[in-house]
Regions:
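Membrane-interfacial entry segments at the cytosolic side of transmembrane helices
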Residues: 161-168, 212-222, 237, 265, ...
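Alpha-helical transmembrane segments of multi-pass integral membrane proteins
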Residues: 106, 226-328
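Membrane-cytosol interface segments of multi-pass membrane proteins
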Residues: 1-178, 273-274, 295-343
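Membrane-interface helix caps and helix-loop-helix hairpins in membrane proteins
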Residues: 110-112, 131-136, 179-189, 230-239
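Short, aromatic-rich membrane-interface segments at the entry and exit
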Residues: 113-116, 164-168, 186-193, 235-245
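Hydrophobic transmembrane helix bundles of membrane-integrated enzymes that assemble
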Residues: 166-170, 193-205, 221-225, 248-249, ...
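A cytosolic-side transmembrane-helix exit/cap motif
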Residues: 134-141, 189, 212-215, 259-269
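Juxtamembrane membrane-interface segments at transmembrane alpha-helix termini
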Residues: 59, 76-77, 129-130, 179-186, ...
Length: 343
């Protein structure tokens, strides 16, 4: 008898919103530091914050896990049609991303930008080889994740059982190494990134056991996460150390059910709009740059703190307002369609 890996409402892992919230704040801090050229020294600004660039891999692993929670069993049991599955992906992503692309084009219009906007609006830009799109440049992560969405039915087949999933993970890890050392394909390539999505799927297959372990043995799970963090900085940010850290972080998160730094109203709120914040934070930075506010203070540290806070707060405000505006537009269009159909 085939074992079912059904994800129910009881499988709601409250800490994941907090994990995503801290990850997006870290990525925003990294981008502000990298683009602002503040000339600040020390471990925090020379190694810690720059390392936050690799938190995108954590997002990929969480995406793999989250998609499995929502759709794995539906795909396996054919309880969702191909049309409904892909419609939901486009409806969730396209309106907000299209709005951002339009704003980016207005801020920096050019023929090249127009071409890139057209590519972005298809959400298929992740299929382009070495696209290096500058319009919403951070959306390369979205491009990779959307290719993952395209391949998700195949992904469900790959992790159809635990034994096969482990074999696929080994192959994906080898492929990751080949991409980096032979094919010269980096993190903007789905094959390079596949290992993170697959490990997210593996964690889904063992989610009940891992959540129980992390819940009962929080100190041990926290210690493993600390060891993974130290290993990352001691051994370097390679695929193995990043996988170790991402797995440790996600497993620790599965055991967080109430209270603490990962489960609280602020973390839940930020985690709920982390996708929007991620896509818009560099647009907010460019606006501040055009207003000559990124170096408002002569002191590099003060200038960085001000800019980072302004970017994060501005991104939150923009995300909330944009979602409100798009919801109003959607409601208006639905009402118009209803009236036309009624007539």
């Amino acid at each position: 008898m085939r074992r079912e890996f059904v994800a129910t409402k009881a499988d709601r892992y409250e800490g994941i919103d907090g994990l995503k919230a801290y990850a997006i704040i870290g990525i925003a801090l990294m981008h502000v530091l990298a683009n602002g050229e503040y000339g600040i020294g020390g471990f925090v600004f020379e190694r810690l914050i720059p390392s936050f660039t690799n938190l995108v891999f954590l997002f990929m692993m969480v995406s793999g896990f989250g998609m499995c929670c929502g759709y794995y069993q539906k795909i396996i049991d054919q309880k969702i049609s191909v049309e409904d599955f892909y419609k939901k992906r486009y409806i969730k992503i396209w309106p907000y991303f299209a709005l951002l692309c339009a704003l980016d084009f207005v801020i920096s219009p050019s023929k090249e930008s127009l071409f890139e906007v057209i590519a972005n609006l298809t959400l298929c830009q992740g299929l382009l080889p070495n696209a290096k799109i500058s319009v919403i440049g951070v959306s390369w992560t979205l491009a990779v994740i959307f290719v993952f969405y395209m391949l998700f039915p195949f992904f469900c087949f790959l992790i159809g059982n635990k034994k096969r999933a482990w074999r696929v993970a080994v192959v994906a890890l080898v492929f990751n190494w080949l991409c980096a050392n032979y094919f010269k394909a980096g993190r903007t390539n789905i094959v390079y990134d596949a290992i993170y999505f697959i490990v997210g799927g593996l964690i889904f297959l063992y989610r009940k056991e891992l959540a129980e372990f992390a819940s009962k043995h929080k100190v041990i799970a926290g210690a493993i996460l600390l060891i993974a963090t130290v290993a990352y900085f001691a051994l370097g940010g390679n695929t193995l150390t990043m996988l170790f850290f991402c797995v440790a972080a996600l497993v620790y998160t599965l055991g967080c059910k109430r209270g603490g730094v990962l489960v609280n109203p602020v973390a839940k709120f930020l985690g709920g709009i982390c996708f929007e914040i991620y896509l818009c934070h560099m647009v907010i930075y460019r606006v501040l740059e055009k207003l000559h506010l990124v170096h408002l203070f002569e002191n590099g540290l003060l200038a960085y703190i001000f800019t980072a806070v302004a970017v994060i707060c501005g991104s939150v405000v923009f995300s909330v307002c944009a979602k409100w505006f798009l919801n109003k537009v959607e409601t208006f269009l639905k009402e118009r369609v209803r009236r036309v159909n009624h007539v």
